[in-house]
């Protein structure tokens, strides 16, 4: 059960959904789901030194150079999407998916981002990351999760963080 006190762990969107569900009257049906944590996202990036490669690419980036920004963003997104999940994270996601799908092979799901810095008073990160609907099966869920993680490094998001003075490492996805 997620609540607004979980924003740092699961981001604003997931915490808000959890809060809303907890406040609904009995009998109101809401689709169930699960969330990975910001810690899991950071573990994914740390696995096999990916975060160091990302930081090295971002450290020398001039976000005013549109071509360089596009190249760096594409390169980082490709690295993230190619990164394997740590075994324990993949196992946890697979188990949560199995519970959620309850053996329904035809079930489809939404894979959505929830950033730890989405709804701040002086910055709005909402809408910068990807959402995927009608995702079918664990393999596609895992693939779309990587695409969601990679979307933290789309050109718009990279530039926005730089211009708002946020360190890239300070924003995580759930």
Predicted regions and their residues:
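N-terminal beta-alpha lobe that positions the nucleotide/phosphoryl donor
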Residues: 1-174
């Amino acid at each position: 059960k997620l609540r607004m006190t979980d924003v740092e762990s699961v981001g604003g969107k997931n915490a808000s959904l959890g809060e809303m569900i907890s406040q609904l009257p009995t009998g109101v049906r809401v689709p169930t789901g699960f969330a990975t944590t910001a810690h899991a996202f950071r573990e994914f990036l740390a696995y096999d030194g990916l975060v160091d490669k990302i930081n090295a690419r971002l450290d020398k980036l001039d976000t005013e150079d549109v071509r360089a920004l596009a190249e760096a963003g594409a390169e980082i997104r490709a690295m993230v999407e190619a990164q394997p999940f740590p075994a324990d994270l993949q196992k946890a996601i697979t188990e949560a998916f199995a519970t959620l799908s309850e053996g329904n092979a035809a079930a489809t799901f939404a894979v959505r981002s929830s950033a730890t810095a989405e709804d701040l008073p002086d910055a709005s990160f909402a809408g910068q990351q990807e959402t995927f609907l009608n995702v079918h099966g664990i393999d596609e869920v895992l693939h779309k999760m990587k695409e969601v993680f990679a979307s933290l490094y789309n050109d718009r998001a990279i530039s926005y963080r730089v211009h708002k003075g946020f360190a890239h490492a300070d924003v995580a996805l759930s």
